[in-house]
Structures are given as C-alpha cells and as structure tokens.
C-alpha cells in the first residue's frame, strides 16, 4: 500500500511538469527546449475571452460604455521573438472577424524571427495608450469612440493592431504648425531612413503579411502617419 502511495505521488509530481498553462504566462521567456518538447502549436491559440481576462479588462479596455459585446472579441496567445532572440509568450484581444488572420500573421512573424519586443494586454497599463506605447507594447482592442463622434474607432472594435509602438509612432503636423507625436518619447524614430530592430518599413515582412490579409497600414496615410498601425 505504501509503495502504491509513493508511486501515485511520483506520478502526480511528474504530471505537474507536463502542465504548461501555468508555466508559460504572457510576458515570460520560453526556452527552445520547452518549445521543442511541447511543439509550437501549443503556444498559438484563439479562444473566447476567459473570465479572468474579462475581469482584468473591466473599466480599462472594456469600459462601462462599451458597445462591443464580449462575444465579438477573441483572446489570442502566441509566441514572439525580441531583438535578442528570446522567445516570449504574447497575448492580444482582437475582434473575432480578424482573429484567424492576426494569429496567422503573428505565427509567420515568429517563424521568421521578426522582432517584436512586447505583447501584453494594454489593461496592464490601465488602458493608457501613451504609457503602453512608451513601453513599445503591441496590442489591439481598447474601446473608445473617434474624437467628437459617436463612431467606435477601429481599436475600439478590435479591428486594428499596433506593432512595436515606440519605434513606429503616430505623427501629424497640425495647421497651426504644431506637431503631434505619440508616444511623445518617439520623436527620435520619426526619421524613417534610420534602421532600428523594431522599426516597420514599407515592404518589410510585417507590412507584407498584414497587407496580404487586407489590412491598411497607417504609414501609407497622406495627412498623418501611424507607422505602428494596421487596420481593417
């Protein structure tokens, strides 16, 4: 009986090491050995919004006046590679209409080792775009209306994706001569002739993959530039 109990305990302990969901959390590095053991497919998934994630979103990206139903959103988990070659678990909430396309794009970017520094839910920055962009975070859903309208923005519907936000800023020159740069710390990256690991260039892999899925790139806009931004 004692031997049987010991065997059961050993099996239980060994089983703990086979439970990946608690071991690989968003933002954490994953070793190549772990990826080989579990397989890449294990890390790429689309699901309805889990209860714990929906609680996190309350009052942040999912505001009290949110007109987008929870059922319209999807939670993506993936892997991405930073400029130092580290494999990192990423997460993103998007509209279900683009979820499959976005996951496919992120998987291809990972396979090509296209560098993405950070991919966490913007709720960890209290849905503050400026703070999250300064952290070079990549994200999608954040409910809001277009300024001075009752129209929900593309991000507000989860139909826009921002990639490597610090190095690919939003830039607009107003009629009064004032410049708008978001995030404010991204002014050094307005010169698109320079090369930075996290900079999106027209024609690069990130650009081509999003365009192939029918997304529009903010870097192509005429009256402003939003180099981080892809939308449908």
Residue ranges of model-derived segments:
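Catalytic cores and adjacent binding grooves of peptidoglycan-active enzymes
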Residues: 146-148, 158-232
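Sec/Tat signal peptide C-region and signal peptidase I cleavage site
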Residues: 19-23
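Active-site acidic/histidine clusters and adjacent loop/turn architecture
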Residues: 68-133
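Active-site-adjacent structural elements in enzyme catalytic domains
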Residues: 44, 58, 62, 93-111, ...
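Bacterial N-terminal signal peptides that target proteins for export
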Residues: 1-8
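Bacterial N-terminal signal peptides
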Residues: 8-16
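N-terminal module-boundary/linker segments of secreted carbohydrate-active enzymes
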Residues: 24-81, 85-86
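Mid-length scaffold segments of soluble, non-membrane domains
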Residues: 116-117, 131-165
């Amino acid at each position: 009986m004692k031997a049987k109990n010991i065997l059961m305990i050993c099996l239980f302990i060994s089983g703990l090491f086979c439970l990946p969901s608690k071991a690989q959390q968003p933002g954490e590095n994953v070793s190549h050995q772990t990826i080989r053991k579990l397989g890449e497919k294990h890390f790429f998934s689309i699901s309805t919004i889990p209860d714990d994630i929906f609680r996190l979103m309350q009052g942040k990206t999912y505001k009290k006046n949110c007109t987008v139903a929870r059922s319209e959103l999807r939670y993506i988990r993936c892997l991405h590679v930073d400029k130092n070659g580290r494999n990192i678990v990423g997460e993103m909430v998007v509209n279900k209409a683009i979820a499959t396309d976005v996951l496919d794009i992120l998987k291809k970017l990972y396979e090509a080792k296209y560098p993405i520094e950070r991919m966490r839910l913007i709720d960890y920055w209290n849905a503050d775009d400026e703070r999250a962009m300064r952290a070079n975070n990549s994200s999608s859903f954040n409910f809001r209306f277009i300024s001075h309208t009752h129209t929900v923005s593309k991000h507000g519907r989860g139909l826009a994706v921002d990639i490597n936000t610090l190095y690919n800023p939003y830039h607009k020159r107003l009629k009064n001569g004032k410049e708008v740069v978001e995030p404010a710390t991204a002014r050094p990256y307005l010169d698109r002739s320079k090369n930075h690991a996290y900079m999106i260039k027209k024609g690069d892999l990130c650009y081509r993959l999003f365009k192939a899925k029918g997304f529009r790139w903010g870097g192509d806009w005429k009256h402003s530039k939003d180099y981080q931004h892809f939308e449908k």
